[in-house]
Amino acid sequence: MDIRAILLIGGISPKDGEPTERFGNIPLACLDVLGMSVEERVVQRLAHFGITICSLIADSPAEGQPFLRCRSLDSRTRPLHAESEQLWQAAEQEFQRCVEDGAELVVVLRLGAYVEVDYEEMIQHHLDRRSCVTQAVDVNSSPLELFVLSASARMDAAELFQSRLGHLRRESEPFQVKGYVNRLQSASDLRRLALDGLLARNAAVPQGKEVKPGIWLGPSARVHRKARIVAPAYVGAGSKIRASALITRGTVVEQHAVVDCGTVVENTTVLPFTCLGAGLDAMHCVVGFRRVAHLARNVEVEVHDEKLVGTIPLSPVSRLAGSTAALFAFLPKEIYRGFVSPWRRKQAVRNAEPSEEAEPSLESPGLEASASESETSEFPSNFAVVRRYGNH
């Protein structure tokens, strides 16, 4: 049976105060969760059930977002762009194209929600009841924007897309999803999806190697030997955790991100290509693209100071050029320091030698004698004696 899928991203016009399904101006479905974007995970799940031909229609042009240009999609996924007002018309036209190409069933899903559904079971439910359109619902019977449409149901498909997935032309028995569901409407939902993946509550497996129980590292991730990582935690591919940094309480650091020296990151998601500055405390938030969303206060702010929240170059060539420039700036300083340091050490030794004409610092001859004898017996003449443990 020829089964195809249409995935939709966007297509909503939220009112003031309603969730936008975006972080900054980027759809949550396009952001990484434990090393792989939500849309990639959905496409991967469809392929697992034999649905390998997908059309992805989004109302966010990749040309306007450099981050979106860097994402990788399956070669069998056909990406399309439509303006927000034209997205539903584009979806209807894509359904017609799928039917003309021989599709017998079409799965329609708006991201929106991340749903772990058994597509084989849902399709069998649809066929057994000879439905034209079958909609999925969660365990509380709340509707999900997930449908299976028969190729013959062209009028039903037109009604569905024209109503923005809000109305069915003919009633049918819904299919209840027993798996994991995340509505993915705000940054807090994105954070919960990542944390649930770390705790194995869903099928979002971290992309990388579990080096210790609950601690995952992606390929080429670098953690300084003086940094601390407390499980559960994830550090994505190419990311850097610098000296004295602390990663704890389910923190997720996505690919090519940097956590600078001495920064504490607790119960936080650091999004890809983000540089978190030195000496900061990032707690209970989502950080990235020069923005911070505090989960407890439900507030999202833009940060203009790159020393606090910066952006790593997206292009590998740009990252290599930056690293090379930093190396060439570092080497002359080290070479100069290597030549100058021996001379400075010799000067320090000469200055530390006692002068024959200098008067004693202590007036008591007995104390002077005992002190000088003990110093001579334990240490060379160019060492200064200090108390090791304070005043005790």
Predicted feature descriptions by range:
Residues 53-59, 135-138, 286:
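Short internal beta-strands
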Residues 63-141:
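Conserved beta-loop-beta/alpha segment of the NTase-like Rossmann-fold superfamily
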Residues 143-156:
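Conserved beta strand-loop-helix elements of the APE1-like EEP
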